[in-house]
């Protein structure tokens, strides 16, 4: 009886020990699993970065390299070489940016670059033309003169003048009758040419249409809009490149004595008129500068409701304009 009791007690103790050992073993296995899981989370940024890099090129990835549902991979790691970070960067940078794109036509060189290119501003230059002399004009045919006038452009000779066309036709007819073996030293027939003005001043007056006077504020605004600068002798000057350091092409003076503009009272004064004048010889081309002064006079007349007069105080019409141009 005592032996049976002892065996029962020993069996119960053994059973309890087995149960306790089983529970303890189970908890230890769970503890190891969670430790590994926590360790994977701590290193997961690197693993996730490799996973994202692998997903960029899915054709080169083995299914064994993915981690599913937070579990560690069961299979052995593959020996396949993953793309390095430098190679991945080169791959991502292989696409050209918009600035590198060039538009071109087939079988031709690129004609336009989409990149941001800043070109230096082109400074305006005063065109210089070689004006033909009177002797050269006399020796030209009408067709040659018209061709040269088209090449010269704005500063060319006005070949539409009836008198000039008649003279050229007569000279051309005479030259065709002369032997072509004549020496260049032989005297040529002199042509009557109007003498050009090379010194002095060319002037244009601008007065109001009515008996009223020009308002100082409006006059100053109109002059400044045309690029005039108040400078030497208290007059407005039109410079070559709109800076006081460049030469003066033509100027504007007040008709009232002493002909100046008070810099400290420009907004309050009135005047009966102004005079535009150009001194010869002028910087650059006299004819081009005279045309520019005429355009400025016409613009001022429109802005200020004025009338342009010649030096003889006559209306500056088309005939007077041609006479002015013929002077230079």
UniProtKB/Swiss-Prot annotation:
Keywords: Cell cycle, Cell division, Cell inner membrane, Cell membrane, Membrane, Transmembrane, Transmembrane helix. It is found in: Cell inner membrane. Residues 57-79 have a biased composition (Polar residues). The chain crosses the membrane at residues 5-25. GO terms for biological process: division septum assembly; FtsZ-dependent cytokinesis. The keyword Cell membrane applies. Interacts with FtsZ via their C-terminal domains. Belongs to the ZipA family. Gene3D superfamilies: ZipA, C-terminal FtsZ-binding domain (3.30.1400.10). It comes from Haemophilus influenzae (strain 86-028NP). It is a single-pass type I membrane protein. Essential cell division protein that stabilizes the FtsZ protofilaments by cross-linking them and that serves as a cytoplasmic membrane anchor for the Z ring. Also required for the recruitment to the septal ring of downstream cell division proteins. Residues 26-328 are cytoplasmic. GO terms for cellular component: cell division site; plasma membrane. Residues 39-79 are annotated as: Disordered. This is Cell division protein ZipA. Residues 1-4 are periplasmic. The keyword tRNA processing does not apply. SUPFAM superfamilies: Cell-division protein ZipA, C-terminal domain.
């Amino acid at each position: 009886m005592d032996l049976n009791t002892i065996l029962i007690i020993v069996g119960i103790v053994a059973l309890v020990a087995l149960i306790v050992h089983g529970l303890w073993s189970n908890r230890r296995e769970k503890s190891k699993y969670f430790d590994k899981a926590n360790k994977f989370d701590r290193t997961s940024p690197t693993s996730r970065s490799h996973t994202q890099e692998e997903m960029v090129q899915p054709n080169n990835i083995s299914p064994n390299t993915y981690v599913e549902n937070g579990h560690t991979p069961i299979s052995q790691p593959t020996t396949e070489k993953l793309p390095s970070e430098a190679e991945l960067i080169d791959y991502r940078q292989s696409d050209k940016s918009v600035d590198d794109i060039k538009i071109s036509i087939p079988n031709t060189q690129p004609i336009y670059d989409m990149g941001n290119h800043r070109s230096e501003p082109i400074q305006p230059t005063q065109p210089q033309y070689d004006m033909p002399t009177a002797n050269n004009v006399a020796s030209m045919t009408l067709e040659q003169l018209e061709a040269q006038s088209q090449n010269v452009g704005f500063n060319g000779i006005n070949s539409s003048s009836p008198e000039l066309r008649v003279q050229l036709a007569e000279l051309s007819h005479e030259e065709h009758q002369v032997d072509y073996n004549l020496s260049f030293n032989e005297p040529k027939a002199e042509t009557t040419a109007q003498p050009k003005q090379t010194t002095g001043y060319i002037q244009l007056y601008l007065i109001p249409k009515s008996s009223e006077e020009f308002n100082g504020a409006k006059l100053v605004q109109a002059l400044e809009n045309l690029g005039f600068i108040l400078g030497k002798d208290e007059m407005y000057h039109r410079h070559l490149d709109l800076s006081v350091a460049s030469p003066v092409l033509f100027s504007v003076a007040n008709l009232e004595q002493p002909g100046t503009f008070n810099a400290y009272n420009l907004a309050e004064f009135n005047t009966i008129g102004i005079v535009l004048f150009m001194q010869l010889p002028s910087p650059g081309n006299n004819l081009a500068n005279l045309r520019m002064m005429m355009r400025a006079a016409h613009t001022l007349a429109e802005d200020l409701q004025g009338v342009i007069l010649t030096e003889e105080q006559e209306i500056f019409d088309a005939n007077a304009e041609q006479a002015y141009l013929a002077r230079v």
